Amino acid sequence: DQGIVNAGILKVITDILDAAKMKYAIYDKTIPNPTDKNVAEAFELYKKEKCDSIVTLGGGSSHDCGKGVGFLAGNGGKIHDYEGVDKSKKPFPPYVAVNTTAGAASEMARFCIITDTSRKVKMAIVDWRCTPSVAIDDPVLMMGMPPALTAATGMDALTHAVEAYVSTAATPMTDACAEKAMEYINRYLRRAVANGRDKEAREGMC
């Protein structure tokens, strides 16, 4: 999205790709709560540039838009066709999700939320194939997050941890993960909000 571009984070990634002489195309029009139109536009660029893989840079919105492109690249049709549970039949292209926030956990989840602009509803897409092939959480990329966004995404992470802990589907393993997440958020979130350059706090929030 444009925030990533304006913050100079995109250039960090493109410099690496340029040094490796890798060709790429950039879609930077994703909005918070990405829409079916975002997905369609991004997929048109994917086809036009003859792309063979997907890299998303950002938070949950960027990753969800990338997942939407993955559905269309691997299976065709429209994103609306995949609303529901496990509607895809074929695998995605290779997909790398690079995080710049610490909250949504979309980079490791099989959920994709896309706004249907005609019905004015959020479509819930649950499909194991949309889990990224590789997820990268680098605290250095999160140091530019402003305090308000750091706090908001941190509370999002806390909400996910509490939800997992009180879920009727919880297991001893998920409880252990949720407890550790709450412990780390309690220890590091306030530090990350107070000083965005605190690498230990940023890493703890990853």
Q: Residues of each region from the PLM?
A:
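N-terminal small/polar loop signature for handling phosphorylated ligands or for N-terminal nucleophile
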Residues: 5-80, 191-202
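Alpha-helix N-cap/helix-start motif at coil-to-helix transitions, marked by capping-box chemistry
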Residues: 7, 11, 131, 149-156, ...
